[in-house]
Structure formats: structure tokens, C-alpha cells
Design a protein with these regions (language model features):
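Short loop/turn segments immediately following beta-strands, especially the blade-tip
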Residues: 63-71, 124-133, 180-189, 236-246, ...
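Bacterial Sec-dependent N-terminal signal peptides
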Residues: 2-3, 16-44
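Asp-box/WD-like beta-propeller blade repeats and closely related beta-sheet repeat scaffolds
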Residues: 133-211
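Blade-level signature of beta-propeller repeat domains, shared across WD40, Kelch, NHL, RCC1
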Residues: 402-443
């Protein structure tokens, strides 16, 4: 029998072939993807918030990533956000730039959200397959407060921290806050009624962070004078069905007082990827704080603080399994690697000092003053392959016009044992000396 002729093929085979052809055609047209405009998620890209303090000039710096971790600017970069960054005309003042997650990507990597910290708005972009960005209609959107510094996605909602420490907007009578938005299908942000949680004046909230199931929100108030003078606090909230936030039992929770000053100030919250554990940098104590949390109530329990050999541990990240943990230590410009096999007792194994740190300047904190490097590291990000860590550095001394460099991006290599090295020089970021670039998103 000649089975190659269509008339001789069984009807079910013909039907199967036809259905397969339809599926292929739909896939080729992108019909199986989300509705935010991209046919496939971008890969091998990196984004930085320029935090440009000139009105209308804040932007997202976009790069493609090569196999060796090196970076090449994306076509069209920088991508304007429609707003301005915040201003910090000081020499390393605590507070204004103490923040985390000023930019976040959707889980499908097709949309990007970033703060305009100096114009009180949130920029929203669609991410094309090639990594280029296009603002969604109506972007940027009011942040419902002053000086937004941190954003987080929880399901179809976006939560924001408004810090209210932008020098160009002080003094004012508004309070810092945590607040929420509904993310509409086209990316627009709609404020959630009654979702705003005010923070005490000068409380300096730094971050908003969602649990794995999006049912809890965590935050850190860097200064929390209403909780306990001179000691920061952590917050946890349950996310209600309507998107409003309910304080968890014991929240806000003052950080544990130690035997000697200085008091602990919290920064750089990060969740263990598989267990109910929260990590926090105790900045002025040079310690890594370890907490557990109740998955239902959100209540936090302090476990311990482990030593960090750097100076002012500020940002924390783990790898995908949670077995490795990395911290950025701000004042001595170092990165620490911890063996996190026991996630309740991380053990520091290495500290690496970054390259090209610039001249020293006096960070004037009165009796606690010290010399600090000009190019000071801030937020880190691991790439998906876990072969590289990117660390952003800012020109931290804004009081000396002659010192114009310091805004850089460091590329660290991760060895098989988790230790890090810096084979090459950092990348100079194309921002003016007055800018304090911040935040990294890496696909």
C-alpha cells in the first residue's frame, strides 16, 4: 500500500498533523505568550537605574551580557524614565542612599519597574525580546508619597517604599510610608485604597520584599526612633485579599541590642529561597542578622547575628539553592562569601576588596568619623548561571567637585567553590558625577 499519499493516511494522523501545524503557527506568531507585548523573554541582559538628579533625565542603563560576563550597551540605552533621581549632596551621609530594590522585573521578565526617587513616580517598561525598553502608556505613575526608593511585585500588585529623604524635597511635613498598587493588564499602576502604612518621621524605610508565595511583605526601617531610640526595626505584613497590608504580630520589631555600641541599623533584607528565613545586614555592628518567620502570620523571630569581617555590611544575596550567601560591605568596599549550608548559621569564608576605589575622604559622623573610599559599593546581583556577581558603586563623596569618578559597575567571577575574584577593571557608568546610580536587575 502507498501510505505516502494523503488519501491513504488514517484520518487521526491527518488531524494530528493539522493540529501540530496550527500549534507551530501560533507559536511562530507569539500567541502563546503573555499580553505585555514581547514574544519571548529577554536573556543575557543587565539594567541599572542611573538615578540622574536632573529633571527628566533619570534613566535605565541597559546592557547585553557576554559569556565572560562583560557588558555592551543595548541599542537605545539609556532609556528615559520620565522623571528624576534623588539628590544627596553629602559626604557619605547615612540614610538617603541606604535602600534596596529600586528596580524589579516581573517573574516572566517582560516588564520592568523602577523608581524616580526625586520626582515621586514609578516608571514602568515593557521589555522586548532584545532587551530594549518601551514605557507603558501613562508611565511614570505617582508613588503616593515622597522619594520612592524600593519596589516589589507580589502577584498582580506592586508595593513601594517612599523614604522621604530627597534633599531637594526637604523639609516637608509628609511621613515616609509603605503603599500598594494594582498592576493592570497593560502595566498601568492603580493605587490600592487604604493600603498606605505611614512610618514615623525620619524612620528611613529602605526596602519592601515579598515572600515566595506573595502573602507576606517585609520591610526595614533604618532609623526607628518611635520603636527604640537609636535602633532600627524590621516590619512584616500580611497581604489581605484586597491588597491592603496588616501588620504581623510583633511588627515593627526592634533589632536586638548588643553588649556595646553602636546600635544595629538594618539594611539589605533577603529571603532564603526555600526556607522561611530572613537575612538582614546589621550595618553598624558588622553582623549578618538571621531571622525565621511564620509563613501564615508573618511574625519574625530573631535567631542570631553572625560576624562579618568587612565594615558596614549593607546588602545580602544568596544563590538559587541558598547554599551560598554574599554580602556587600560598604565602607571598606568589600564582598564577603558565606557558606550557607546551615542556613541558620552562615559561616564567612572569604572577603574580597574591590578594585579602583578612588581617593579617601572623611565620612564625618562626629565621634564615629572615619576615612572612606570615594567609590563605594552598593547593591549586588548574581547572574542566572551563578558564574558572576555584579556590584554597583557610587561616587559617595559629593562635596569635592574635583573628584568626578566613582560611579562604576564591578564584574566578579564566582569559582566552583563559591569564592569570588575580580579579573578585570570595573566599568565606568555613563552618568554625571552628581548621580548616584543604584539597583541591578540581571536576566
Amino acid at each position: 500500500m502507498n501510505t505516502s499519499h494523503p488519501a491513504n493516511l488514517p484520518r487521526r494522523l491527518l488531524l494530528g498533523a493539522a493540529l501540530s501545524a496550527v500549534v507551530v503557527a501560533i507559536a511562530a506568531c507569539g500567541g502563546g505568550n503573555d499580553d505585555n507585548g514581547a514574544t519571548a523573554a529577554a536573556r543575557n541582559v543587565l539594567y541599572v537605574v542611573s538615578n540622574h538628579p536632573t529633571p527628566g533625565q533619570n534613566s535605565i542603563l541597559g546592557y547585553t551580557r557576554a559569556a565572560d560576563g562583560s557588558l555592551t550597551p543595548l541599542p537605545g540605552s539609556p532609556f528615559l524614565t520620565g522623571g528624576k533621581g534623588h539628590n544627596n549632596p553629602t559626604a557619605g551621609l547615612l540614610g538617603p542612599n541606604d535602600l534596596d530594590q529600586p528596580m524589579v522585573a516581573s517573574k516572566d521578565k517582560k516588564r520592568l519597574y523602577a523608581v524616580n526617587a526625586g520626582s515621586n513616580t514609578i516608571a514602568v517598561f515593557n521589555v522586548a525580546t532584545d532587551g530594549t525598553l518601551a514605557a507603558v502608556p501613562g508611565s511614570p505613575f505617582p508613588s503616593e508619597g515622597r522619594n520612592p526608593v524600593s519596589v516589589e511585585i507580589a502577584g498582580n500588585r506592586l508595593y513601594v517604599v517612599n523614604k522621604n529623604e530627597d534633599a531637594d524635597q526637604l523639609p516637608n511635613a509628609e511621613l515616609p510610608n509603605y503603599t500598594g498598587f494594582t498592576i493592570e493588564s497593560d502595566g498601568r499602576l492603580t493605587p490600592i485604597a487604604n493600603s498606605t502604612i505611614p512610618v514615623v518621621k525620619n524612620g528611613s524605610p529602605t526596602q519592601v520584599l515579598a515572600s515566595r508565595d506573595d502573602k507576606l511583605i517585609f520591610g526595614a526601617d533604618f532609623f526607628a526612633p518611635a520603636v527604640q531610640p537609636g535602633i532600627g526595626s524590621l516590619r512584616s505584613f500580611r497581604v489581605n485579599a484586597d491588597g491592603t497590608l496588616a501588620q504581623a504580630p510583633g511588627s515593627p520589631l526592634a533589632l536586638p541590642a548588643g553588649p556595646v555600641p553602636p546600635p544595629p541599623l538594618p539594611l539589605g533584607l533577603y529571603l532564603h529561597p526555600t526556607q522561611n528565613i530572613l537575612y538582614a545586614g546589621f550595618v553598624t555592628r558588622n553582623q549578618l542578622g538571621v531571622y525565621t518567620y511564620d509563613a501564615v502570620s508573618g511574625a519574625l523571630t530573631f535567631v542570631r547575628a553572625v560576624a562579618n569581617s568587612g565594615k558596614e555590611i549593607c546588602w545580602v544575596r544568596t544563590n538559587a539553592s541558598g547554599a551560598r550567601l554574599y554580602t556587600v560591605n560598604n565602607i571598606d568596599a568589600s564582598v564577603s562569601f558565606y557558606d550557607n549550608t546551615n542556613p541558620l548559621q552562615p559561616a564567612e569564608r572569604q572577603k574580597l576588596t574591590l578594585k579602583e576605589l578612588g581617593p579617601m575622604f572623611l565620612n564625618d559622623r562626629g565621634a564615629d568619623s572615619f576615612l572612606q573610599v570615594t567609590s563605594t559599593p552598593f547593591q549586588p546581583a548574581l547572574d542566572p548561571s551563578e558564574k558572576f556577581i555584579y556590584v554597583i558603586s557610587q561616587r559617595a563623596d559629593a562635596t569635592h567637585p574635583a573628584v568626578t569618578e566613582g560611579n562604576k559597575l564591578h564584574i566578579l567571577s564566582i569559582a566552583a567553590d563559591g569564592t569570588v575574584s575580580q579579573p578585570g577593571a570595573p566599568l565606568n557608568l555613563p552618568v554625571p558625577p552628581s548621580a548616584r546610580p543604584m539597583g541591578l536587575v540581571v536576566f
